[in-house]
Amino acid sequence: MLRGNAPAKVDEKGRVKIPSIFRAEIEQEFGNEFYVTSLRGDCVRLYPFPIWNELEQKIASLPQSDPAVKVFLRNTNYYGQMTTMDNQGRILIPALLRDSAQVRNEVSVQGHLKYLEIWNAEILRRQLDELPFSEEHEQALSKLGI
């Protein structure tokens, strides 16, 4: 499971080095191929390809006429691209997605159990301040058994 948060930097070529707290597990568990995408363009989602492939299989089994499926496919394909981690642990983020998510220089890489999110560090801080974990969130999770 990918968990935690680590700072990283996006270089001038648009590559981000995967922080060591995630890299070893990713290489061992999933290999070096990824699907890099976004749902809304506000952050980068980095899926190890085996995880993305599982998700695609689930989506493929759903009615393709469902509006949520259409929007999911439209957005993840618009922002998405296959990529390979190089020997130095770097992933190229497509220019379109770098610009949309404003991921330049200092970024925050967060584990989301099966995938990573890469955020502009300042935007993430604002998101955390604007939408703090509330009692409503706690109650909703309690209903899910957490």
Tell me what each language-model feature is.
Residues 1-7, 12, 23-88, 96-146:
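Flexible "stalk/tail and boundary" regions
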